């Protein structure tokens, strides 16, 4: 049966659940072509869900199991190790993609930290059961991830969810859904789609109508002062970077999907341990910084400093061992040619000044680390 392009895009939301397990990589300061920080892939949660009857959350959990019945065959057919998930879903449009990323950040900033943490932990567990040539998680973990994401989405006002949907649709070539569907059993894809629609209705029943207030942001703290110093020293370097380049979408040389997944898992664990208010503040700082980005993809000096301060506070809220797990995992997956290549594209004096300032900032953050 022929589906409209828009309906086919909705079908991709089923795949999004597993894509979160296998493909999503988030960094603290990525280019406009990547999803921003932990906030982009995070979705949202709500106080309203916490105060609702226990059966409220169970209804989403039960619906997730039914979705699993309808979609797991489809999930097993998707090649989650395919490099296609690194590509733009159509014409490369960095600044347009950034608008979609911004909507994701806004949605993520509405998250209840407890539900966000639960979703991250569900993803971590699901990564542990990934197996087979296609890199699919177990059926039980598939259900648990979908349930966690359903609760997260239910905690966000519908308009925020639709903002993400609409903005992603604008940068997605209309031929993409049909192509992706051609890679799996059409019948299984249709069954998954119908299951997703039923799941969507259950989630929508519990959806909140308003988002929580903004995060609290410290002022005059040592990390904030150090972030200002870092930003002043590194802003010339920042302005020399080509943020609109497609290099950020290139796969790491010689690194398999499974190797990348191990590094991604360390990031998810770190995100799950971070302070919820600090994460929210970092997402809000990124959102504001996106608003001041110029035609070259560079944010204002003030917003750059605010983002650095926010990220410093996030990192300080996580044990050093967890941060080093991320560092070591990424170092092991990064060929030595990559830093040299990136270094060659900017003024080396400015790059060295930025690095020196970063090490000083790192020491201040570490001193505040729990």
Curated annotation (Swiss-Prot):
SUPFAM superfamilies: Peridinin-chlorophyll protein. Sequence repeats lie at residues 58-220, 221-370. Coiled coil: none annotated. GO terms for molecular function: chlorophyll binding. GO terms for cellular component: chloroplast; light-harvesting complex. Keywords: Chlorophyll, Chloroplast, Chromophore, Light-harvesting polypeptide, Plastid, Repeat, Transit peptide. Residues 1-57 form a transit peptide. The record marks 123, 286 as: Chlorophyll a binding. InterPro entries: Peridinin-chlorophyll-bd_prot (IPR003376), Peridinin-chlorophyll-bd_sf (IPR036550). Pfam families: PCP. It comes from the Eukaryota. Its main location: plastid. Water-soluble antenna for capture of solar energy in the blue-green range. Peridinin is an asymmetric carotenoid. Homotrimer. The mature protein is composed of 2 almost identical repeat units. This is Peridinin-chlorophyll a-binding protein 1, chloroplastic. The lineage of its organism: Eukaryota, Sar, Alveolata, Dinophyceae, Amphidiniales.
């Amino acid at each position: 049966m022929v589906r409209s392009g828009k309906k086919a895009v909705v079908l991709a939301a089923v795949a999004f659940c597993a894509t979160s397990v296998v493909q999503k990589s988030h960094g603290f300061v990525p280019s406009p072509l990547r999803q921003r920080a932990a906030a982009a892939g995070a979705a949202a949660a709500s106080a309203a869900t916490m105060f609702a009857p226990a059966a409220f959350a169970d209804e989403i959990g039960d619906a997730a199991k039914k979705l699993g019945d309808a979609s797991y065959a489809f999930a097993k057919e998707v090649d989650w190790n395919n490099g296609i998930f690194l590509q733009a879903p159509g014409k490369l449009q960095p600044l347009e993609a950034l608008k979609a990323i911004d909507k994701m950040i806004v949605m993520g900033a509405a998250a209840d930290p407890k539900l966000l943490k639960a979703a991250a932990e569900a993803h971590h567990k699901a990564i542990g059961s990934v197996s087979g040539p296609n890199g699919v998680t177990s059926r039980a973990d598939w259900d648990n991830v979908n349930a966690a994401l359903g609760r997260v989405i239910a905690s966000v006002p519908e308009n925020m969810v639709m903002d993400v949907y609409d903005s992603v649709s604008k940068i997605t070539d209309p031929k993409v859904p049909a192509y992706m569907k051609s890679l799996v059993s059409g019948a299984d894809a249709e069954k998954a789609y119908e299951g997703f629609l039923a799941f969507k209705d259950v989630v929508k029943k519990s959806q909140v109508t308003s988002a929580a207030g903004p995060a609290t942001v410290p002022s005059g703290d040592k990390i904030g002062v150090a972030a200002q110093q870092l930003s002043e020293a590194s802003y010339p370097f920042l302005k020399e970077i080509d943020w609109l380049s497609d290099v950020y979408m290139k796969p790491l040389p010689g690194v398999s999907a499974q190797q990348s997944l191990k590094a991604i898992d360390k990031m998810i664990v770190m995100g799950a341990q971070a302070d919820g208010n600090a994460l929210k503040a970092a997402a809000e700082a990124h959102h504001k910084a996106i608003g001041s980005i110029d035609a070259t993809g560079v944010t204002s000096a003030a917003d750059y400093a605010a983002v650095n301060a926010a990220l410093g506070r996030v990192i300080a809220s996580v044990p050093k061992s967890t941060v080093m797990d991320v560092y070591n995992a990424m170092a092991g997956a990064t060929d030595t040619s990559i830093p040299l290549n990136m270094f060659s594209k900017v003024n080396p004096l400015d790059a060295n000044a930025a690095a020196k300032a970063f090490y000083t900032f790192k020491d201040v953050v570490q001193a505040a680390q729990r």
